[in-house]
């Protein structure tokens, strides 16, 4: 698993993509953790920016703690996507008054297995929580439920991560 990246002083690259880690958390039934953005009718996987010079795995664990209250001992890393996956933001989401302009996200995605009790999940540990609700969903449901501009990335992420779950020590998706 690639763990180091260098964004010098900005997490936005020369092409305008913000570096980000995404988290796909599975339970022992092969379902996926699905979180509702605070105050919105929008559901997604946890994700967040990578700080300059921050190793990917460290960023993932930081986001895991900030967004859903889990610690490294609560999860097992099953794998990570091989490459950066990108999506462009629709025009209405681009902040044109900030520099550098962020026109989208480039993400590395981690597949994690929850160890132990789901009661460890806490959405209220951050000063500015991202989510106000969560649920377990069937493996492929997020592709159709996420906001439209993220669907292609979600499909690619789940297609790649599904292979890791099918490995001898993994779960079968949807079981």
What are these model-derived regions, one by one?
Residues 139-175:
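Charged phosphate-binding loop/patch that engages nucleotide di/tri-phosphates or the phosphate backbone
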Residues 1-22, 28, 99-100:
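Acidic, metal-coordinating catalytic segment for phosphate/diphosphate chemistry
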Residues 39-41:
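A conserved beta-turn-beta hairpin within the catalytic core of GNAT-like acetyltransferases
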Residues 24, 53, 156-157:
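A periodicity- and composition-biased signal for non-globular, repetitive helical segments
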Residues 50-148:
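Unchanged
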Residues 25-28, 37, 112-114:
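Active-site beta-strand termini and strand-to-loop segments that position acidic
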Residues 44-48:
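A short gly/proline-enriched turn/hairpin at secondary-structure junctions
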């Amino acid at each position: 698993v690639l763990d180091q990246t260098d964004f010098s002083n900005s997490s936005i690259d020369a092409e305008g993509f913000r570096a980000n880690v995404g988290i796909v958390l599975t339970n022992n039934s092969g379902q996926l953790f699905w979180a509702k953005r605070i105050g919105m009718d929008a559901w997604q996987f946890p994700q967040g920016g990578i700080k300059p010079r921050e190793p990917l795995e460290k960023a993932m664990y930081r986001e895991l703690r900030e967004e859903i209250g889990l610690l490294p001992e609560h999860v097992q890393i099953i794998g990570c996507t091989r490459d950066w996956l990108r999506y462009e933001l629709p025009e209405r989401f681009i902040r044109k008054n900030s520099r550098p302009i962020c026109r989208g996200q480039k993400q590395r995605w981690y597949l994690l297995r929850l160890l132990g009790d789901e009661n460890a999940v806490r959405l209220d540990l951050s000063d500015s929580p991202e989510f106000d609700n969560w649920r377990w969903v069937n493996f492929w449901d997020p592709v159709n439920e996420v906001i439209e501009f993220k669907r292609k990335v979600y499909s690619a992420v789940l297609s790649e991560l599904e292979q890791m779950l099918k490995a001898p020590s993994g779960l079968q998706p949807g079981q």
